[in-house]
């Protein structure tokens, strides 16, 4: 009988659903394992083969852990609010909910066709009112704790999309060709900076890829420095500037402030006022990325004012430049051009002094010297000398001196900025806030606050969302008086900040999550998804989780204990899959042609899970042939009936081979080395085929090992062998350590440390036998002839070394 994957896969998917095979266990006395995918945004284009990689990996682990005795939580849902659905609604007039429901149905169909063992009873959708009720509730907890506030801020405004972009979203939109400018707008902002230190410190407790942790460290951007008060000439005040290099203060030759600095226009002298105003106006139209790009030519304007360097007493010209951001430090910096590349380029461009204060191997007039591993020079006055000191010592001495003079203080700063949370669009969670005529603000008490129906989805010309046009929803009265509802909506990130918690208790109408269930399941043991979410989603989720921890809602400090980033699967042209390149391989196409088990195995066999690798259709043919070999153990060629294997004992060599396979597949599966686990199973299949083995123990063991990878075929063959239970409920095979040990050892023989030959002996042979056999090796004997052996070194099962003279 030929393997008909179409009917067999449908049969088992239907049965799994009917029998709730993958329902989450409720026995809290068992060990638990929570394996989670980064849930998808259900786009109209559907899933391609690259999307399936991470889902397949998580499913293999979920199945493996179930068979290893764990209660497994393996859920799926939909991050369904977002801009693409709204843009489609603007274009077609179709309500976003309609397109979202169609897209979800398409996505779910593909995931079910892959045989993923999700507990679909726990399915969630961020656009369901029963879900976003709790998203709104969490927002109000942030508001009550002073972590959500309104502010008139300069935002990243995308003219084409008519909405605000978070700082973290700007790069992507610019790369896509959108225009991003800065403009002031009333915004809701979340005070993520209040958690900066904890977000940074707790990274050390996480089993995450080091590059992802480093990206978060860089984004948080903690630095230790000194805030220095520079006395202004002709002004009865000071200008504060933050620096991480107080050791270079003697080399500061000018100051630079951000165009948005509150003193920018005040510092402009009469002759400079016009050019200063023009420069400030132009700077405000640029995004932060445009302003701070390392390759851009530095621009600036002199204010006409000066400050005094407290170490030298020399006047420092004060400039305005857009490479300084008001959001970092004080919005003012001291510039030491000899030892900072940006300052050096600016000084050269505007002919400003360059003074060496760190001993440099070259002329700092010709090139900057930025290394810290040198000593201070030209750094002394009547009260303090840094000359000859290293960085750390000079830092401390200067910081102490500045504090003693009351012109500076030590300070920790962060690059992290508060999260601009509101969006000027329709398809997002309404922010549950009422604005009253007397100026007070009160939260909505009756959650969820749902979106009203609208006829047009375009943002208003003033930048408000379409909700501003729905008067019957917008305006109301209650016991506190007349009010106007908040028209901004939440960003797409809101729903994904806490979804992992809702999966634990998705049908709870009384609270976000039941405490007992949360304490059992949290935190997530394995979180699989793309590295592109390193800063955005992961940082935001960690922030919300820490707030919920402080509220007593959750019991863990962090949501995701282990993070794994799968590598991208490229198109067959070795390029990233995209519609514009025409190299997208739709998942449904390969499923129809090869079946789910072949696709699952092939994606995992392509290479290490974390590596980028190209799709190759020829490769999946080889996987299909491998599955055919497995099929023929039970359904030989030209046979319509299943053959029942023999119960005769396995030959010793095959028995050892089987136990080694069990160990290797188990070890590699648990460490996500799926490609080598599959390779080991292929070797075992070839051994069984070559020897004509028809042993029940060997074949059933193979099926149990293969079941997490190819669940449909293994279920079918398991049933054909006479079993009535699902193979998904079978324990994963265990190996006998005595049968796994190597019974032969290859011994390397060295003479004076150089390899001269090898020989093979039974493992654990005594030292005397190893020395005797080593001397007999022909290629070794000639190097011993006529020599005196002064020392013999033996490493059991590995090495013999003769020291001769």
Curated annotation (Swiss-Prot):
A motif ('HIGH' region) lies at residues 40-51. CDD domains: Anticodon_Ia_Leu_BEm (cd07958), LeuRS_core (cd00812). A motif ('KMSKS' region) lies at residues 576-580. Gene3D superfamilies: 3.10.20.590, HUPs, Isoleucyl-tRNA Synthetase, Domain 1. One of its GO terms (molecular function) is leucine-tRNA ligase activity. It is found in: Cytoplasm. Its EC number is 6.1.1.4. One of its GO terms (cellular component) is cytosol. It comes from the Bacteria. It catalyses: tRNA(Leu) + L-leucine + ATP = L-leucyl-tRNA(Leu) + AMP + diphosphate. One of its GO terms (biological process) is leucyl-tRNA aminoacylation. Keywords: Aminoacyl-tRNA synthetase, ATP-binding, Cytoplasm, Ligase, Nucleotide-binding, Protein biosynthesis. Belongs to the class-I aminoacyl-tRNA synthetase family. HAMAP family: Leu_tRNA_synth_B (MF_00049_B). This is Leucine--tRNA ligase. The gene is leuS.
């Amino acid at each position: 009988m030929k393997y008909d994957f179409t009917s067999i896969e449908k049969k088992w998917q239907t049965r799994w659903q009917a029998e709730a095979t993958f329902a989450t266990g409720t026995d809290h006395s068992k060990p638990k394992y929570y394996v989670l995918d980064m849930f998808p945004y259900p786009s109209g284009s559907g899933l391609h083969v690259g999307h399936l990689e991470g889902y397949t990996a998580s499913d293999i682990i979920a199945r493996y852990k179930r068979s290893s005795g764990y209660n497994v939580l393996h859920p799926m849902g939909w991050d369904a609010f977002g801009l693409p659905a709204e843009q489609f609604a603007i274009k077609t007039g179709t309500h976003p909910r309609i397109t979202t429901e169609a897209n979800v149905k398409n996505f779910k169909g593909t995931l079910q066709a892959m045989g993923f063992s999700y507990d679909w009873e726990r399915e969630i959708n961020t656009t369901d009112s029963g879900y976003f009720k709790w998203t709104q509730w969490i927002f109000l907890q942030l508001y009550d704790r002073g972590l959500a506030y309104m502010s008139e801020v300069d935002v990243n405004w995308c003219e084409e999309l008519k909405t605000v972009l978070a700082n973290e979203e700007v790069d992507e939109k610019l790369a896509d060709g959108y225009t991003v400018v800065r403009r002031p707008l009333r915004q809701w902002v979340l005070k993520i900076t209040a958690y900066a230190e904890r977000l940074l410190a707790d990274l050390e407790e996480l089993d995450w890829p080091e590059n992802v942790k480093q990206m978060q460290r860089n984004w948080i951007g903690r630095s230790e420095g000194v805030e220095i008060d520079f006395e202004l000439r002709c002004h009865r005040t000071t200008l504060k500037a933050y620096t991480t290099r107080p050791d270079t203060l003697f080399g500061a030759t000018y100051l630079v402030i951000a165009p948005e600095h509150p003193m920018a226009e005040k510092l402009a002298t009469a002759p400079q006022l016009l050019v200063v105003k023009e420069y400030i106006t132009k700077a405000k139209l640029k995004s932060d990325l445009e302003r701070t790009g390392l390759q851009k030519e530095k621009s600036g304007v002199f204010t006409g004012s000066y400050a005094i360097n407290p170490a030298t007493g020399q006047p420092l010209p004060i400039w305005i430049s857009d490479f300084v951001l008001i959001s970092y430090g004080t919005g003012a910096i001291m510039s030491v051009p000899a030892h900072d590349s940006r300052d050096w380029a600016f000084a050269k461009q505007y002919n400003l002094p360059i003074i060496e204060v760190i001993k440099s191997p070259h002329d700092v007039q010709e090139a900057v010297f930025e290394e810290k591993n040198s000593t201070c020079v030209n750094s002394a006055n009547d009260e303090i000398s840094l000359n000859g000191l290293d960085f750390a010592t000079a830092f401390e001495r200067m910081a102490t001196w500045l504090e003693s003079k009351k012109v500076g203080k030590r300070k920790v700063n962060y690059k992290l900025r508060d999260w601009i949370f509101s969006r000027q669009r329709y398809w997002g969670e309404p922010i549950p806030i009422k604005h009253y005529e007397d100026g007070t603000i009160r939260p909505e008490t009756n959650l969820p606050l749902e979106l009203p129906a609208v006829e047009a989805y375009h943002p208003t010309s003033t930048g408000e969302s379409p909700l501003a046009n729905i008067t019957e929803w917008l305006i109301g009265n209650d016991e506190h008086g007349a009010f106007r509802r908040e028209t901004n909506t939440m960003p797409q990130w809101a729903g994904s900040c806490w979804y992992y918690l809702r999966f634990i208790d998705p049908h709870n109408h009384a609270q976000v999550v039941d405490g007992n269930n949360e304490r059992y399941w949290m935190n997530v043991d394995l979180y699989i998804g793309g590295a592109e979410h390193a800063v955005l989603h992961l940082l935001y989720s960690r922030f919300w989780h820490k707030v919920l921890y402080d509220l007593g809602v959750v019991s863990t400090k962090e949501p995701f204990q282990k993070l794994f980033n799968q590598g991208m699967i490229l198109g067959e042209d070795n390029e990233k899959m995209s519609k514009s390149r025409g190299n997208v391989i739709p998942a449904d196409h390969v499923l129809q042609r090869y079946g789910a088990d072949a696709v699952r195995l092939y994606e995992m066999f392509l290479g290490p899970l974390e590596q980028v690798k190209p799709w190759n259709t020829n490769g999946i043919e080889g996987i299909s042939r491998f599955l055919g070999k497995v099929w023929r153990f039970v359904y030989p060629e030209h046979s319509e009936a299943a053959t029942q294997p023999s119960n005769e004992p396995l030959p010793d060599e095959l028995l050892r081979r089987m136990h080694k396979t069990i160990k290797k597949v188990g070890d590699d599966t648990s460490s996500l080395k799926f490609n080598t686990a599959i390779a080991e199973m292929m070797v075992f299949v070839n051994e069984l085929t070559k020897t004509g083995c028809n042993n029940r123990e060997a074949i059933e063991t193979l099926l149990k090992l293969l079941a997490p990878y190819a669940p449909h075929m293994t279920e079918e063959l398991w049933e054909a062998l006479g079993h009535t239970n699902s193979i998904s409920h079978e324990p994963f095979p265990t190996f006998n350590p005595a049968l796994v040990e190597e019974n032969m050892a290859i011994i390397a023989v060295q003479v004076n440390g150089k390899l001269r030959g090898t020989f093979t002996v039974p493992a654990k042979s005594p030292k005397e036998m190893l020395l005797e056999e080593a001397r007999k090796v022909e290629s070794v004997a000639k190097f011993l002839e006529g020599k005196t052996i002064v020392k013999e070194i033996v490493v059991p099962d590995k090495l013999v070394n003769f020291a001769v003279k």
